[in-house]
Amino acid sequence: MKQTNVKPAEGRLGIMVVGCGAVATTFMTGVLMTRKGLTKPIGSMTQYDKIRVGRGADKKYLHYKDIVPLANLDDIVFGTWDVYPQNAYQAAVYAEVLKAKDIEPVREELMAIKPLKAAFDRNYAKRLDGDNVKDCKTRWDMVVELQKDIQNFKKEHGCERVVVIWAASTEIYVPYDEAYHMTLEQLDSAMKSDDREHIAPSMCYAYAALTEGCPFIMGAPNTTVDIPAMWELAEKTRMPIAGKDFKTGQTLVKSGFAPIIKTRNLGLAGWFSTNILGNRDGLVLDEPGNFHTKEVSKLSTLETICRADEQPDLYGNIYHKVRINYYPPRNDDKEGWDNIDIFGWMGYPMQIKINFLCRDSILAAPLLLDLTLLSDLAARAGRYGIQRFLSIFLKSPMHDFTRGEEAVNNLFEQYTMLKNAIREMGGYEADEEID
């Protein structure tokens, strides 16, 4: 075991969530209830998973907190921004994800979490009509106001550290443009000239977070930190960034099931994925411009697992389609349908059907906990820039596409990356030995 330079998790950890909707309030409520011993954080890898460290007679399986210094749940303080002014208790009740018995015991704590005014541009989320928004003339003004919010929150709550995580709606698609997104100088210039076409509000949150010494996590498929200019800023500020798009349901299944097809060298003719969703996320995604952002994210999984360049006979002509349908009666209870057309020996066709009846926010909440705790850990370990070891939590993991890097989407390879990062930060050797 090697000596490490990971700083201890001393003092309070502020978690500032962009968005105070179903996902955010389910996350907050679960953490607060867990602290009181009234529920368990099921689904959280940082709270439940064990990793093997050592080999032979020295082999043992330890929880993450016994390998690396994770922040304690009792030390977490929540803050949030939202376009709607309702406090976290009101928002949790409105979301109808959790039952009253799971909200009322922490009512006072949730009521104390009041959203700050959001940096918002309705052109990026046309289905939202909240008025709890900042009056900013330019994108740069948004950055300055958000920086002040982080400074004030940190001071007011006595936080040693703050992590900012996006759990708000998907913005309309902003394609990467080398003329605006390549360098930090370009990004600064675009923000200060109020270039609203190329600078999304989410970029202002990321910029403010990084410049205030806070790791930033993009939980939606927004472009935001997935551009070289933001990587440069993360390097300059020595802060971790992670993204994008929480991997909760259908894509989680896809990233775990596609490796089965690949491992057995079965052919894949097509994969049709659709789901129905009735919460505010579904409402926003009913807008074509916003759905396109999500579509790009969800379509990226298969091609890096079942590779046409490696096995053209098996994967050279895959038809991959993804659809999301807004269906209000289901609210947060998302249902995913997958039809997978495969072929085997001598080209004979077969089919696989998957029907996943899930709860969107219940699956997402533990990801917020894990991503924030591990990003805070990464910052204290001196890790900055893109945190590829967090890919297991994300639909479209960030990678340096300017250097020809490809995302790792295979769930089992992602798990190895996560375990090895924890091992290394804990002073143990990384390895790929089968557990």
Predicted regions and their residues:
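Short glycine/serine/threonine/alanine-rich loop segments
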Residues: 213-214, 239, 265-266
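Glycine-rich, aromatic-lined ligand/substrate-binding cores of catalytic
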Residues: 297-386
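Short flexible/disordered coil segments
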Residues: 222-237, 275-287, 304-313, 331-344, ...
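A generic structural signal for short, non-catalytic loop/turn and secondary-structure boundary residues
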Residues: 71-73, 157, 261, 333-335, ...
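Metallocofactor- and cofactor-centric catalytic cores in central/energy metabolism, strongly enriched
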Residues: 1-220, 224-236, 250-258, 351-435
